[in-house]
Amino acid sequence: MENISNRDKALILNQALPYIQKYTGKTVVIKYGGSAMENPELKKKVMSDVALLSTVGINVIVVHGGGKDITAMLNKIGKESKFINGLRYTDSETAEVVKMVLAGKVNKDLVASLENCGGKCLGICGIDGKMFKVSKYKGDDDLGFVGDVDHVDTDLLNTIITNKYIPIVATIGCDDEGNVYNINADTAAARIAESLKAETLIYMTDTPGLLKDKDDENTLISQINIKDIDNLIKDGTISGGMIPKVKHCIDAVENGVSKVFIIDGRLCHSLLIEMFTDEGIGTMFHKD
């Protein structure tokens, strides 16, 4: 709320109050990534917003990936990153790097950042408490140690939330044999939100949301019924990497999440604008 007059701050808080009251005691899952995670100034503002959400009584869960950090570490050890149809191929050596980077560096950096902004948080991963029951990715391509989340045991998450901490979740998990798998963060966020019957799931991205014209950010679709999604995929309005993200949104809504949003994480305080204002800022997915 930099460079805003006291009068405008009061008006903003007045508008936010009913939304704060609505969300108090509810669970909000935030998939954190993109520029909001890579830009230090944006990162600080997002962590400050997350701390604020927790302070007003919202049960916040942050789910993160860390693809660029994984690639950087692989480069340091002289190992080339391999992608198949845009998805990282994870052999056994890469799986060890993924485990080290996501559950180590990235997760603990986020914990430190959020704690520095006044949040109480705990960094965990899908292996902890056997939170994720994982099996090998079932898509058309063999991606090595890339996993699907078959089940989320919510006991650990509920324990952390009950004790007024914010879980920060790194998206790795293991199967019944103890093999460690790299898990898509969008997938993990959706499964967590579904398992907790969260009030809201928010994907922070590098796009304003769904656009009628992908080259014109002024064509934002502010809300959409999930039954209309297939037509937008067929006519090419939704394409490329946005298709799997949107399908996760559909799954979440169909499995008990009240509202799902795709918002522009490049904009300062986009979380607060989406949650606490009449207009919002991204695309909301809902059903009848």
Curated annotation (Swiss-Prot):
<keyword id="KW-0808">Transferase</keyword>
<keyword id="KW-0067">ATP-binding</keyword>
<dbReference type="InterPro" id="IPR001057">
    <property type="entry name" value="Glu/AcGlu_kinase"/>
</dbReference>
<feature type="site" description="Transition state stabilizer">
    <location>
        <position position="31"/>
    </location>
</feature>
<dbReference type="GO" id="GO:0005737">
    <property type="term" value="C:cytoplasm"/>
</dbReference>
<comment type="pathway">
    <text>Amino-acid biosynthesis; L-arginine biosynthesis; N(2)-acetyl-L-ornithine from L-glutamate: step 2/4.</text>
</comment>
<dbReference type="InterPro" id="IPR004662">
    <property type="entry name" value="AcgluKinase_fam"/>
</dbReference>
<keyword id="KW-0418">Kinase</keyword>
<comment type="similarity">
    <text>Belongs to the acetylglutamate kinase family. ArgB subfamily.</text>
</comment>
<dbReference type="Pfam" id="PF00696">
    <property type="entry name" value="AA_kinase"/>
</dbReference>
<keyword id="KW-0963">Cytoplasm</keyword>
<dbReference type="InterPro" id="IPR001048">
    <property type="entry name" value="Asp/Glu/Uridylate_kinase"/>
</dbReference>
<comment type="function">
    <text>Catalyzes the ATP-dependent phosphorylation of N-acetyl-L-glutamate.</text>
</comment>
<keyword id="KW-0547">Nucleotide-binding</keyword>
<dbReference type="InterPro" id="IPR041727">
    <property type="entry name" value="NAGK-C"/>
</dbReference>
<protein>
    <recommendedName>
        <fullName>Acetylglutamate kinase</fullName>
        <ecNumber>2.7.2.8</ecNumber>
    </recommendedName>
</protein>
<dbReference type="GO" id="GO:0005524">
    <property type="term" value="F:ATP binding"/>
</dbReference>
<dbReference type="GO" id="GO:0003991">
    <property type="term" value="F:acetylglutamate kinase activity"/>
</dbReference>
<keyword id="KW-0055">Arginine biosynthesis</keyword>
<dbReference type="GO" id="GO:0006526">
    <property type="term" value="P:L-arginine biosynthetic process"/>
</dbReference>
<dbReference type="InterPro" id="IPR036393">
    <property type="entry name" value="AceGlu_kinase-like_sf"/>
</dbReference>
<keyword id="KW-0028">Amino-acid biosynthesis</keyword>
<feature type="binding site">
    <location>
        <position position="88"/>
    </location>
    <ligand>
        <name>substrate</name>
    </ligand>
</feature>
<feature type="binding site">
    <location>
        <begin position="66"/>
        <end position="67"/>
    </location>
    <ligand>
        <name>substrate</name>
    </ligand>
</feature>
<feature type="binding site">
    <location>
        <position position="182"/>
    </location>
    <ligand>
        <name>substrate</name>
    </ligand>
</feature>
<dbReference type="GO" id="GO:0042450">
    <property type="term" value="P:arginine biosynthetic process via ornithine"/>
</dbReference>
<dbReference type="InterPro" id="IPR037528">
    <property type="entry name" value="ArgB"/>
</dbReference>
<feature type="site" description="Transition state stabilizer">
    <location>
        <position position="245"/>
    </location>
</feature>
